């Protein structure tokens, strides 16, 4: 049995790398640091950092902190978080991912221009909470690209000029499926010549803010992180190339769920684990009881490479022949 570790399309993305590096640096300097929410959606990595002095706090505990040092994670935060930090004299280490920061700015400016904000994303995801905060928590948030959940559409006003954006870790095909269905729905309400949606760039928004450009009433901006989405095809191919795939990610990881689904579609013998102890020997054997020839180990953008290496080493020591 050969164990193949994916080093090209697994492991921390740049945004998470920056957050972890900043946390380690602050912990080394000060010996302690608060993180507002899980620093990354990976319990194994959270435990490692907590052993170094990181303390994770929820919203209630965050509001009660005074004169402390707090880290803002890569997911970003709404304006209200920074207001509380100022009021409570908190020192903030802001590690919001640059891609997320640009998305927050886009959302804020479009809202100021009078657009109804539609977010393709998960309502409870920290990144979406931060984005929604840029538009006074008035965004219409849609998780199901096929519009199969009517509750998600209750706040949608077809009479308003609207802009569609996305949580950075959602899937590209889903975004464009949602865009097409929204176009059709708005077309039923508006005249056909007014229902065309225009793709916009940051420069277009800036021009509109200064009055140089007049934008149409229906817009969309594909804000999905390409560093994340580019992994999709690579993981698909990696899964096809191995008899069995062990996908390693935190159970809370949104990106992990998306990438695991891609692996599972490519190779039905793909298995999701968070901890090494979850691996079952029967996964690694064929129906005749013989060991499979190849096992691939891969993971999400929130999975540390050290943990992937640990899983691969465990497989080599205990199952490889």
Swiss-Prot record:
This is 4-hydroxy-3-methylbut-2-enyl diphosphate reductase. InterPro entries: LytB/IspH. Catalyzes the conversion of 1-hydroxy-2-methyl-2-(E)-butenyl 4-diphosphate (HMBPP) into a mixture of isopentenyl diphosphate (IPP) and dimethylallyl diphosphate (DMAPP). Acts in the terminal step of the DOXP/MEP pathway for isoprenoid precursor biosynthesis. It catalyses: isopentenyl diphosphate + 2 oxidized [2Fe-2S]-[ferredoxin] + H2O = (2E)-4-hydroxy-3-methylbut-2-enyl diphosphate + 2 reduced [2Fe-2S]-[ferredoxin] + 2 H(+); dimethylallyl diphosphate + 2 oxidized [2Fe-2S]-[ferredoxin] + H2O = (2E)-4-hydroxy-3-methylbut-2-enyl diphosphate + 2 reduced [2Fe-2S]-[ferredoxin] + 2 H(+). Belongs to the IspH family. Its cofactor is [4Fe-4S] cluster. Keywords: 4Fe-4S, Iron, Iron-sulfur, Isoprene biosynthesis, Metal-binding, Oxidoreductase. The lineage of its organism: Bacteria, Pseudomonadati, Chlorobiota, Chlorobiia, Chlorobiales. Isopentenyl diphosphate binds at residues 41, 75, 125, 253-255, 302. One of its GO terms (biological process) is terpenoid biosynthetic process. It comes from the Bacteria. [4Fe-4S] cluster binds at residues 13, 97, 225.
């Amino acid at each position: 049995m050969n164990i193949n570790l994916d080093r090209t399309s697994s492991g921390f993305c740049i945004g998470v790398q920056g957050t972890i590096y900043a946390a380690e640096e602050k912990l080394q300097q000060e010996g302690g640091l608060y993180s507002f929410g899980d620093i990354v959606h990976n319990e194994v990595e959270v435990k490692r950092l907590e052993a170094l002095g990181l303390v994770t706090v929820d919203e209630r505990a965050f509001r009660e902190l005074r004169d402390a040092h707090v880290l803002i994670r890569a997911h970003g935060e709404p304006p209200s978080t920074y207001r509380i930090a100022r009021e409570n004299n908190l020192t903030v280490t802001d590690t919001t991912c640059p891609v997320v920061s640009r998305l927050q700015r886009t959302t804020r400016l479009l809202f100021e221009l009078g657009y109804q904000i539609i977010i393709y994303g998960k309502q409870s995801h920290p990144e979406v909470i931060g984005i929604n905060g840029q538009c006074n928590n008035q965004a219409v948030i849609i998780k199901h690209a096929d519009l199969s959940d009517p509750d998600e559409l209750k706040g949608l006003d077809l009479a308003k000029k609207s802009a569609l954006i996305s949580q950075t870790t959602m899937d590209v095909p889903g975004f464009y499926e949602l865009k097409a269905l929204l176009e059709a729905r708005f077309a039923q309400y508006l005249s056909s010549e007014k229902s065309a949606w225009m793709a916009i760039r940051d420069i277009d928004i800036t021009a509109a803010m200064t009055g140089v450009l007049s934008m149409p009433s229906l817009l969309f901006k594909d804000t999905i992180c390409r560093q994340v989405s580019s992994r999709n095809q690579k993981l698909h191919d990696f899964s096809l190339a191995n008899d069995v795939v062990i996908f390693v990610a935190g159970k809370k990881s949104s990106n992990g769920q998306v990438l695991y689904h891609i692996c599972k579609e490519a190779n039905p013998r793909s298995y999701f684990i968070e901890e090494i102890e979850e691996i079952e020997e029967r996964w690694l054997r064929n129906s005749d009881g013989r060991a499979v020839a190849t096992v691939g180990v891969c993971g999400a953008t929130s999975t540390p490479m050290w943990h992937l290496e640990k899983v691969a080493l465990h497989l080599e020591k205990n199952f490889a022949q």
